[in-house]
Amino acid sequence: MLVVDDDEIIRQLIAVNLTLEGFEVLTAVDGRDCLDKVTEASPDVITLDVMMPRLDGWVTATQLRKNPETAGIRVVLISARAQEDDRARGRDIGVDAYLTKPFDPAEMIRVVRELAGAPNTAFD
């Protein structure tokens, strides 16, 4: 499990909640850090903030999907942007789920549990 968010408070909130649910969690501060860590960590699921410096979530998710070594990793985009065109963009990239901030930690945990070990399919 890899949690990617430039906001330390949100990153730690997600990581702590997932750790309490039994997930082994690694964190990254932005998209570039995510791409550096993903090959060595081989996570099953990545929670990925959209708005980040250096490399945003859109570009990071696209690069994950284009790389055969990371294309099968489940990706949950998390964003304050709740417009349908943002969700559509996520579907076009091939992310597995899209959560909007503020999100219910229980919902995030449910989504991550469903995706852990599930085949890669764009969210509904």
Enumerate the predicted regions with their spans:
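Receiver (REC) domain active-site loop signature in two-component systems and cognate sites
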Residues: M52, V75
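Active-site beta3 strand of CheY-like receiver
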Residues: A41-T47
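Charged docking surfaces used in two-component/phosphorelay signaling
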Residues: Q12-L20
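Short, glycine/charged-rich "phosphate-handling" switch motifs in NTP-dependent
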Residues: D96
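C-terminal output helix
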Residues: F103-R113
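Short hydrophobic/Thr-rich beta-strand motif most characteristic of the beta2 strand and flanking loop
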Residues: G22-V29, K37
